[in-house]
């Protein structure tokens, strides 16, 4: 558009320069009346074609956006049934207190055993005195007659010696007494 305008201006200047030169004629006495030189009408520049209207309007929206999917209906939770009331756990009874062991009575101090009564010492029985056997008188010799001055036999020698049965009785009696004493001591300890 600017180029066409510059070309038109150049053409106008050239035409004006050509027509403005004077003719080479001889001088006359009467000058010719000046001819009004009207410049030719300026060439009008070609009409600038208006640019076509820019139709950059956005295309009409033909398809409406799909409706947003409605959220799924919230399913109402089932009514919460109250949990069955469970009875509180029964507290287990405390363990039985261990009863103290029964106090055992202190052992009764047993008295020291009494020394056993020693059985009475057995009195040795007197040995029977045996008379020495006198030699039998010979038939030829006659026994001497006792003189009147010689003492007669004593009563001790004449008393009979204790028989063996008496000695046995004394031993049995002493054993019986000692066994009775020993038995009574045992019974006393048991009580």
UniProtKB/Swiss-Prot annotation:
TM regions (residue ranges): none
GO cellular component term, pick one: side of membrane
Gene name, Swiss-Prot/TrEMBL: AGP9
Similarity comment text for this entry: Belongs to the classical AGP family.
Domain of life (superkingdom): Eukaryota
Record-given protein name: Classical arabinogalactan protein 9
Signal sequence bounds: 1-20
Carbohydrate attachment residues: 26-27, 31, 33
InterPro entries recorded: AGP9/17/18 (IPR044981)
Compartments in which it is found: Cell membrane
Main location class: membrane
Tissues expressing the protein: Predominantly expressed in flowers and at a lower level in leaves and siliques.
Function: Proteoglycan that seems to be implicated in diverse developmental roles such as differentiation, cell-cell recognition, embryogenesis and programmed cell death.
Species of the source: Arabidopsis thaliana (Mouse-ear cress)
């Amino acid at each position: 558009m600017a180029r066409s305008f510059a070309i038109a201006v150049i053409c106008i200047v050239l035409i004006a320069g050509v027509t403005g030169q004077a003719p080479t004629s001889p001088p006359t006495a009467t000058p010719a009346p000046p001819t009004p030189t009207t410049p030719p009408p300026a060439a009008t520049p070609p009409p600038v074609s208006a640019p076509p209207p820019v139709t950059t309007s956005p295309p009409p929206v033909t398809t409406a956006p799909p409706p947003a999917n409605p959220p799924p209906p919230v399913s109402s939770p089932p009514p919460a049934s109250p949990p069955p009331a469970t009875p509180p756990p029964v507290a287990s009874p405390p363990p039985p207190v261990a009863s103290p062991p029964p106090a055992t009575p202190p052992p009764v101090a047993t008295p020291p055993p009494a020394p056993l009564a020693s059985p009475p010492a057995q009195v040795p029985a007197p040995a029977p005195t045996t008379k020495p056997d006198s030699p039998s008188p010979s038939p030829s010799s006659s026994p001497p007659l006792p003189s009147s001055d010689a003492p007669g036999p004593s009563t001790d020698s004449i008393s009979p010696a204790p028989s063996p049965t008496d000695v046995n009785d004394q031993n049995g009696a002493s054993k019986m007494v000692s066994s009775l004493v020993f038995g009574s001591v045992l019974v006393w300890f048991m009580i």
